[in-house]
């Protein structure tokens, strides 16, 4: 933890309230070991907002479309999720490492929603010249895929339609008289068939990250230490939306959009510090330079 003048000197206004330096899991000396952990789970909605059923709807003057539909049940499911992590560690006192790969797949409670990602990490520590020089290496690679992103365009809107849509309307247009891809999709008081709303629209976000860094520590003299840290970070985000041409009351051509963004960051930090105790006094001197 860096605070007071030392944080501001190196990190500028970003370090006004202090800086916390985080170290992730690292390797240790010893024989190579392999570990695995994972889990599987299912989820459910603990509580649902109470809405009128068919009988209550009709008793309050609603139009009877001939069916008894629970729209919340139609647009939700019991999702299955699982996660896996495999790690490899080993090395000697002069060089040790840790490598891991993890995968996570979470189904969403709403239809056509979910998230999955893969993360690979590598870290290593190296000691040179009887630990006068220490080097720490880190690298991370991540890819993710999100479907049905929670926003006003997707899940939340579908839930809102499910709360207000006619509970006597059918899910599907069995007569085929409505040109809406087989769904019953007549607007009722400004709301649409929630199932059609989800199934005839797609929203997907894919992206990734690569980050690599190295930290070199030089123990010059007792109490005097110099450090240099450099990192590269690249990320990309690819977003796409699609609306079927069969969506009721929309353009016969449908619609689609796509956006792609990338970011590249470089960081260089150098510090030198001196720590010395004089009887009851303790002296700490720190100087540094940061480029980003």
Language-model features: locations:
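Short, glycine-/polar-rich solvent-exposed loops and beta-turns at beta-strand/coil boundaries
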Residues: 11-16, 113-116, 151
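Outer-membrane beta-barrel strand-turn architecture
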Residues: 26-28, 91-94, 128-130, 218-224, ...
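Outer-membrane beta-barrel architecture
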Residues: 21-23, 35, 85-89, 100, ...
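Solvent-exposed loop/turn segments connecting transmembrane beta-strands
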Residues: 79-81, 109-112
């Amino acid at each position: 933890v860096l605070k007071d003048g030392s944080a501001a000197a190196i990190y500028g206004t970003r370090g006004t309230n202090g800086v916390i330096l985080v170290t992730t899991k690292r390797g240790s000396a010893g024989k190579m070991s392999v570990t695995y952990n994972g889990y599987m789970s299912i989820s459910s909605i603990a509580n649902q907002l109470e809405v009128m059923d068919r009988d209550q709807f009709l008793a309050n003057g609603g139009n009877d479309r001939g069916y008894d539909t629970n729209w919340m049940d139609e647009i939700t499911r019991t999702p299955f999720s699982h996660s896996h992590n495999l790690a490899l560690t080993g090395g000697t006192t002069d060089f040790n490492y840790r490598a891991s790969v993890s995968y996570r797949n979470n189904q969403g409670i709403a239809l056509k929603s979910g998230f999955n990602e893969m993360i690979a990490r590598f870290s290593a520590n190296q000691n040179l010249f009887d630990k006068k020089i220490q080097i720490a290496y880190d690298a991370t690679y991540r890819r993710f895929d999100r479907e049905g992103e929670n926003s006003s365009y997707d899940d939340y809107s579908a839930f809102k339609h499910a709360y207000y849509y006619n509970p006597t309307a059918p899910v599907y247009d069995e007569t085929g008289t409505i040109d809406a891809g087989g769904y019953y999709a007549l607007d009722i008081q400004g709301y649409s068939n929630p199932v059609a709303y989800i199934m005839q629209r797609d929203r997907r976000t894919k992206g990734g990250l690569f980050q690599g860094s190295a930290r070199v520590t030089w123990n010059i003299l007792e109490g005097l230490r110099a450090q240099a840290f450099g990192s590269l970070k690249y990320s990309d985000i690819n977003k796409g939306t699609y609306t079927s041409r069969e969506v009721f009351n929309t353009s016969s051509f449908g619609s689609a959009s796509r956006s792609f963004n990338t970011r590249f960051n470089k960081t260089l930090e150098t510090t030198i510090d001196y720590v010395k105790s004089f009887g009851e006094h303790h002296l700490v001197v720190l100087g540094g330079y940061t480029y980003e």
